[in-house]
Amino acid sequence: MSDLWIIILTALAGFLTGVMSGMFGIGGAVISTPAINWLGATPLAAVASTLPSIIPGATSGSLRYRREGLLNKRVILWTALSGVTASVSGALLSGKVPGDGHLLMLLTAGLVAFGAIQLGRKPASNEGVEELAAEGASDAGPHAGIEISAQLATAKPRTQWWRLMIIGIAAGGLSGLLGVGGGLIMVPLFTRWVRLPLKMALGSSLACAGILAIPGTITYAIIGQIDWLYALPLAIGIIPGAHVGSALAIKSPDRTLRLIVSSVLGVIAVAFAIGEIYAIIY
């Protein structure tokens, strides 16, 4: 395949990656990594070359969420603060993981599947109460407003620094080690454990994914594992894609978006698991 076709197809993969990134709050490496591997990049170069594209894509998408007031600065700060160190450590250890990373990817698939199931359940944040109000709480009787206010009071986001730092370490480690943006676990944890409304969880996760990709990108660039023939077209394609994806997410009804996000994460988890089991066996 000529370099021109590689550039065109990689840019297209970048656009699709961006749509998924913006809509689901993830780095999008689940599309870009296998895509550029199929186009000729080595497995290690495919992992390393996705990280540079996550940065502009996450920036494009998170700016769209910011316009709608859907970024939680405290969540982003503490999660990214701990995640940056973990991302560097993960990148440095990427070549030393037993089993070529397959066992770790299986564990990641299990975590994503669990997160998808949790995300698909009834909301654990204010989102659920807001949905109740939107669907006609006035029909529930004269005390409905009091009940909703009480639920809102008890469903405040849990943004303790230690809770966010644990999420950052896990997400950053995966970002550096496997070349994934970390959003695969941040979105479910932000919604279920931190109790952010879904759209705020998506926007905050996307912003964190971009920050966490920076140290990993620098580390991989220094050790010479990034193939810029793939990295640059990916970055060019992902920027408009992320803007489109984030706009679609923002305009979608919360309940519909929750079902879509949980379903997509579930499919990703199953695909990851099947692929890694196949790689281990064969």
Predicted region positions:
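Juxtamembrane transmembrane-helix boundary motif
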Residues: 1-17, 37-39, 64-171, 192, ...
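Generic transmembrane alpha-helix signature in multi-pass membrane proteins
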Residues: 31-33, 59-71, 174-175, 186-191, ...
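Alpha-helical transmembrane segments of multi-pass membrane proteins
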Residues: 9-13, 52, 167, 201, ...
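Juxtamembrane transmembrane-helix termini in multi-pass membrane transport proteins
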Residues: 18, 29-76
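Transmembrane alpha-helix interface/packing and boundary motifs in multi-pass membrane proteins
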Residues: 13-25, 169-178, 212
